[in-house]
Regions:
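Conserved alpha/beta enzyme-core scaffold
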Residues: 1-145
Length: 147
């Protein structure tokens, strides 16, 4: 199979990719540096079209674009598995929650279906010649979404 050709066929813009997100969806952003920077910006641009989108991440390294607008909490709710200082700022704005758990439990939440995920968006490495991507810091649990 020619993975590079298949990848090129599926490749789309961030603005087009985030059109799959609907009001009420759970969107998973991954962890730390895996947060989808470009997709986050595109999703924030759709803010006025959406209500009650629940976004989940952890150890946030930069303020997500979806959290920056004045009325962001009317459209998006941030849910953090583990809080960084940025996650705490989002929660203090009244638009986020902390999900208490131990990191070692995280794969089970996904494996057993306890973490609803309608849309998953994370940054990965470029595809290698075998068609593989690296989940990097999210590999302990994100791979369970695609198996």
């Amino acid at each position: 199979m020619d993975y590079a050709a298949l990848y090129q066929k599926k490749l789309t813009s961030a603005a087009e990719a985030v059109k799959v997100v609907k009001s009420g969806d759970w969107v998973d952003y991954g962890w730390c540096t895996n947060h989808p920077y470009t997709l986050d910006k595109a999703l924030a641009a759709r803010q006025n079209e959406l209500k009650d989108v629940k976004v989940r991440g952890g150890v946030t390294m930069w303020m997500p674009e979806i959290c920056k607008a004045e009325d962001a909490g009317e459209h998006f709710t941030w849910n953090s598995w583990h809080c960084s200082g940025i996650d705490r700022k989002i929660i203090s704005k009244g638009m986020g929650y902390f999900i208490p758990m131990r990191y070692s439990e995280l794969p089970r939440f996904y494996r057993d279906g306890n973490a609803t995920v309608d849309v998953a968006m994370i940054q990965v490495t470029p595809m290698d010649k075998h068609g593989n991507f690296s989940y990097a810091l999210a590999c302990s649990h994100f791979c369970l979404l695609y198996t």
